[in-house]
A protein has these predicted regions:
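A non-catalytic alpha/beta surface segment that caps or lines the substrate-entry region
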Residues: 22-68
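Active-site metal-coordination/substrate-binding segment of hydrolases
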Residues: 45-49, 54, 64-167, 222
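N-terminal capping segment at the start of a domain
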Residues: 1-34, 174
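Midchain, well-structured core segments that form catalytic/ion-binding scaffolds
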Residues: 127, 131-286
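Short, hydrophobic/amphipathic alpha-helical packing segments
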Residues: 41, 98, 102-105, 242-250
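Short, conserved glycine- and acidic-residue-centered signature motifs
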Residues: 37, 91-97, 237-241
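Short acidic, glycine/proline-rich loop/turn micro-motifs
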Residues: 28, 89-91, 232-235
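Generic non-transmembrane alpha-helical segments
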Residues: 9, 13-16, 20, 43, ...
Length: 286
């Protein structure tokens, strides 16, 4: 088979998947447990079936396709990525890795190759954390790090919990722990991914091999102050939560630069309470 045929099929699959967005023409918005996510999941299932995989969707919404190996008892080789996105995100973020994993399985099938151990293609649900502010939901469930209490705790900006969103999506959150894989059952994991930074593009390099991976920590900080009238409260009598928060925020990027070891930092969300233009904020979250 010519490489052009393979890359052409991958491109065709990606072009099809990118249509499942809530913001056509303005980047990809495919939040977890939505209509767009369901459409993408079903399309991935169809591709996996065509590639000869045994297909299922687990209790966390992960789409999983298995090619049985000569010795299924061995820890599997897993390959894939996520199928959700941020708001107005890149068209191929995540789905490139899922589609490439399925193509690997297809090539094994077409060439009559049976792997030594199971090969598993996966599309993870809610890696980004855009809707509920958490992230790694599907992969976390596979590791046994998600339970019913977790699903009830986290909510989106409309007050919908992961628990209720899963029920609307057709999943049973009471069975979330069923998504856990036995310890040691995954031997290797591979992910093909778009470059999300500017380095390879700026250096005109087509591909890079990752030798380490980013460890992400997320925090929600709440600064407490006191609400006052913005027009009549003197500056020296204010307890302005925003004033205090911005002083901290301005230092965060400086701390990352001072480390000079590749550490990065981002404050991507700021919210004030009560949020009025003429009211000194009593709370500021970032």
């Amino acid at each position: 088979m010519e490489i052009e045929e393979v890359t052409g099929r991958i491109a065709e699959n990606l072009e099809h998947l990118k249509r499942y967005t809530a913001t056509p023409g303005d980047g990809c918005t495919r939040l977890p447990f939505t209509k767009e996510a369901r459409e993408a999941a079903e399309y991935l299932k169809s591709l996996m079936t065509e590639a000869g995989l045994e297909v299922r969707e687990d209790a966390a919404g992960n789409v999983i396709g298995v090619m049985k190996g000569e010795d299924p008892a061995l820890p599997c080789v897993m390959m894939g990525s996520h199928y959700d996105s941020v708001v107005n995100g890149g068209d191929f973020d995540g789905i490139a890795g899922a589609v490439c994993a399925i193509e690997v399985a297809r090539q094994l099938k077409e060439k009559g190759v049976t792997p030594k151990r199971n090969f598993v293609a996966v599309g993870f649900c809610d890696e980004e954390g855009m809707r509920f502010g958490t992230g790694y939901f599907g992969s976390g469930a596979m590791l046994g790090n998600r339970d019913v209490e977790y699903c009830k705790k986290f909510k989106d900006t409309d007050g919908v919990s992961i628990y209720d969103a899963m029920k609307s999506y057709g999943l049973d959150p009471e069975k979330i722990t069923d998504a856990k894989w036995p310890e040691g059952s995954i031997g290797h994991f591979l992910e093909a991914h778009i470059e999300q930074g500017p380095v390879l593009d700026a250096e005109n390099i087509e591909i890079g091999l990752v030798d380490c991976i980013v460890g992400i920590q997320r925090y929600m900080v709440t600064v407490h102050g006191r609400a006052d009238h913005a027009g009549t409260t003197p500056m020296d009598m204010r307890l302005d939560a925003v004033d205090a928060a911005t002083k901290v925020i301005s230092k965060i990027a400086d701390w990352a630069r001072e480390k000079a070891d590749g550490t990065v930092s981002t404050v991507g969300y700021i919210n004030t309470v009560p949020g009025g233009m003429n009211i000194v904020a009593e709370e500021c979250q970032f």
